[in-house]
Amino acid sequence: MAHTSKTVIVTGGSQGIGSGAVQAFLDRDYNVVATSRNVTKSKDLPSSRKLALVDGDIGEATTAARVAETAISTFGSIDALVNNAGIFFTKPFTDYTAEDFKRLVSTNLDGFIYMTQLAIKQMLGQKSGGSIVSITASLADNPIAGVNASIPMITKGGINAITRSLAIEYAKDGIRVNAVAPGVVDTPMHTNSPKDFLKRLSPMGSISNVHEIVDAVIYLTEAPHVTGEVLHVDGGAHIGKW
């Protein structure tokens, strides 16, 4: 087990990939601040003196401010950020509404911007570098016929793009910025989806599990010479038609 006094923020930390990441970081002796709308009610998170929980909508700037302040006041630093909070739903393009778009932008983009700005400002002040890892989606690189997610992919593709831009902007400050792009992952988001259908969305004919995504997050958080990378964990779905 790695031993560290570093502090990581995990958004969308109450279940699925988020709660898996929280546990993995705790196992590696990180201090963790986890946030989601109702993270204090999560049954997937352990009780730990190294874990602080902050309820709130990450699409609101005040939530991001409270999360950053909790990290600094409780643990003294922000050394890593995992932008995991996100929403996703499919519709034909012409059925998406203006309200759908606002919801997607609020959580997927506004939340990313608010939290990442505060994390980078703190990292710059600490002068010890840092890591930012965001969860995007394989679909942003390779759409799949029958999975109508054009509007959500505006947000996920945007995060892929800003990941590369920020990696260049802050490279000399030692702040690394990367992303993990999953395909279908066995999380509560897909509880009611037919597993046979989901398996067909990958050339390997299988569904990723949370631990596989979390392993990628941990790798990118700790890899000292990797930045600007969008790491696909999708059974090959980003490659193209199969």
Set out the residue ranges of the language-model regions:
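Conserved glycine-rich cofactor-binding loop
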Residues: S14-Q15
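Active-site loop of short-chain dehydrogenase/reductase
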Residues: S5-K6, S77-I78, M123-A137, K172-I175, ...
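Substrate-binding pocket helix/loop in short-chain dehydrogenase/reductase
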Residues: P92-F93, D100-V105, L198
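C-terminal substrate-recognition "lid" of short-chain dehydrogenase/reductases
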Residues: I175, N209-V233, H238
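Conserved NAD(P)H cofactor-binding loop of Rossmann-fold oxidoreductase domains
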Residues: N84-F89, G236
